[in-house]
Design a protein with these regions (language model features):
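Glycine/small-residue-rich loop that forms an oxyanion/phosphate-binding "nest" at active or ligand-binding sites
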Residues: 65-94
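Boundary-proximal intrinsically disordered activation/regulatory segments immediately upstream
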Residues: 1-66, 152-153
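Short, acidic/turn-prone active-site loops that include or flank metal/cofactor-
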Residues: 54-56, 82-84, 151-153, 178-179, ...
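RNA substrate-binding interface of SAM-dependent RNA methyltransferases
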Residues: 74, 78-79, 83, 105-204, ...
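Active-site/ligand-binding-proximal alpha/beta "capping" segment
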Residues: 197-250
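Structured adenosyl-cofactor binding patch, chiefly the S-adenosyl-L-methionine
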Residues: 97-99, 137-141, 155-168, 232-251
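Anion (oxyanion) recognition and catalysis
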Residues: 40, 69, 190-191
Length: 251
């Protein structure tokens, strides 16, 4: 279980994978057939594959092996029982397949947002499950791009990608420089024509269906961290605040 080929699966934490193997790009682990398929479709390079026998024999398993053969030729493929895979990964696997993949250089914010119309900006969303859920919602609602501050969980963390159902490979995103947030980033967004709205609980917050927002050509929706929400300085830098009405005091 501790061969060099399996080291990336059982001896490195995800934050180490980001820097240890290739400081400029690093690696990540994609989990589950659907997530792996979407990562391959997005052009991410597979480096090795670890899977249960039942997954290797499944239709999606054969599809994944076929796609990998097309784009990368031969890579290490290890087949084992669910118990062995769970021991290697350190937790119970429900979907029986892990793929080590190479990260790509992140795009610049200007390139990502130049032609977009609707973007989401995440400020210090630290839980990978929440990041994944936001990406899934962003994909469903037609958000063109997502910007994340440096304090956010990595969208390519295993849990984030799994919860997103692989949409982290479909919705373009990048991580902002800490020194640029929020003042410089807000200034850049305005220069690109964005109307910025903070999702915040304030008495003067607009409803999402407010007429003021109907004809906004380019909209940047700013969402804050779990619990505390957006920082006061961030809210002050936005053009408007928006609040989704909820019953029973739920916020």
């Amino acid at each position: 279980l501790h061969t060099p080929e399996l080291e990336i699966y059982n001896e490195r934490r995800e934050v180490q994978l980001l820097h240890y193997y290739e400081p400029e790009r690093g690696l990540f682990i994609a989990e589950s057939p659907n997530v792996i398929l979407r990562a391959l479709a997005a052009g991410y390079e597979p480096l090795s594959l670890l899977m249960e026998q039942r997954e290797a024999d499944s239709e999606k398993g054969r599809e994944i092996l076929g796609r990998i053969a097309e784009v990368s030729g031969e890579i290490p493929v290890d087949v084992a029982s669910n118990e062995v895979l769970s021991e290697i990964s350190g937790f119970k696997l429900a979907r029986g397949m892990l793929c080590a993949m190479r990260r790509r250089a992140l795009p610049k914010m200007e390139d990502l947002c130049g032609n977009a119309r609707r973007i989401a900006v995440l400020e210090n969303v630290v839980n990978p499950t929440n990041v994944g859920a936001i990406f899934r919602s962003a994909a469903a609602l037609g958000i063109d791009a997502v910007l994340l501050t440096g304090g956010c969980s990595d969208p390519l963390y295993r849990r984030a990608a799994r919860v997103s159902m692989g949409t982290v490979f479909q919705v373009p995103w990048t991580i902002l420089e800490t020194k640029d947030w929020p003042e410089h980033t807000m200034e850049q967004l305005r220069k690109m024509g964005y109307h910025t709205v903070a999702m915040a609980l304030k008495e003067d917050s607009l409803r999402p269906d407010d007429e003021k927002l109907h004809n906004v050509e380019k909209l940047a929706i700013i969402l804050g961290t779990e619990g505390e929400g957006l920082a006061a300085d961030t809210i002050a830098d936005c053009d408007d605040t928006v609040c989704i009405p909820m019953a029973h005091g739920v916020d």
